[in-house]
Amino acid sequence: MGIHGLAKLIADQAPSAIKEQDIKNYFGRKIAIDASMCMYQFLVAVRQDGNVLQNENGETTSHLMGMFYRTIRMLEHGIKPVYVFDGKPPQLKSGELEKRGERRAEAEKLLAQAQEAGEQENIDKFSKRLVKVTQQHNDECKKLLTLMGVPYIEAPCEAEASCAALVKAGKVFATATEDMDGLTFGTGVLLRHLTASEAKKLPIQEFQFTRLLQDINLTHEQFIDLCILLGCDYCGTIKGIGPKRAIDLIRQHGSIEEILENIDSSKHPAPEDWLYKEARGLFLQPDVVDCSTVDLKWSEPDEDALIQFMCAEKQFSEDRIKNGCKKILKSRQGSTQGRLDTFFTITGSLSSKRKEPETKGSNKKKQKTGATPGKFKKGK
């Protein structure tokens, strides 16, 4: 689910923290990808006849097709993807998972009614609501990635939290997910629409976390409290508090505790036994992968094993799989060229108070080449 209304709130309150990017701008970047979100995207994708992709045995294979081709697309653009799979959900998420189960049961009833009435639009709509990523989907995608030579990580808990930890540790450049709670976990850069279908022609949205906090004038802890007020997976929220009011209250009072002290509880009651402190703790100190043990390596695809798995077992076209292998190998040859900015380290900006020896035209040169940390161009 992520954080309710956070993307729109950022667009309204801190638009310069968002940039629209083309995939080619991430050449040479290592990016941690929320695997569950990807698989869900692939599973809800349908063919023109309205059916999910299946093999002759009736097994769903759309997750494998999506994982294969979207991964190749990233590799062709010089991106080094690492997929991060969800581990065991935290206990606090049990309430949200229970609600999802109830929504699935309701969707099953509505689907049956739509099928009886022959309403194709509603059949498609409610069928998508019943899509669930299973352990088999996870295992098959892990096998596929291994055969493609692409690394993956099994997170101990939430994938987005481990993605954020990898970014903080400098192992990868960004987190790629559609869920905005990657920012709540503190990822320095969050990318949306990286794994979206090319047919949708969606520009990649790049969120800069440091710039976001600067623009909304909140600390990370205050931002977490804001996200809890907006609505997250771990607990309820105060009734009748919308996004604009939530950020105003955090700016005014600084924390949920102070808000509860000053708000009219008869108009805006908090949930009974509200576990906001526990939710805050999960965002601040999540259970994540030990980044010091992570050694990311991309290798050549195992073409024979890929053909056995994808063609003999899953009945994909052998020509297409072979062609995909050629693209992976070609991308590996191109990826030996690094990003120019990886050869330099910015150690800090020059102090304006410090006098430097001046030569003719030096002021102009400084203006052209000087870099100030934390400044980004507003996306078009």
Curated annotation (Swiss-Prot):
Reading the lineage from the top rank, the first entry is Eukaryota
Region described as Interaction with PCNA: 336-344
Q: Which cofactor does this sequence's record say it needs?
A: Mg(2+)
Q: Which stretches does the entry tag as region I-domain?
A: 122-253
Keyword Glycoprotein in record = no
Q: Which GO terms describe its molecular function?
A: 5'-3' exonuclease activity; 5'-flap endonuclease activity; DNA binding; magnesium ion binding; manganese ion binding; RNA-DNA hybrid ribonuclease activity
Write out the residues that bind DNA: 47, 70, 158, 231, 233
SMART domains documented for this protein: HhH2 (SM00279), XPGI (SM00484), XPGN (SM00485)
Post-translational modification note: Phosphorylated. Phosphorylation upon DNA damage induces relocalization to the nuclear plasma.
Entries under HAMAP family matching the protein: Fen
**Protein name listed in UniProt:** Flap endonuclease 1
What organism is this sequence from?
Salmo salar (Atlantic salmon)
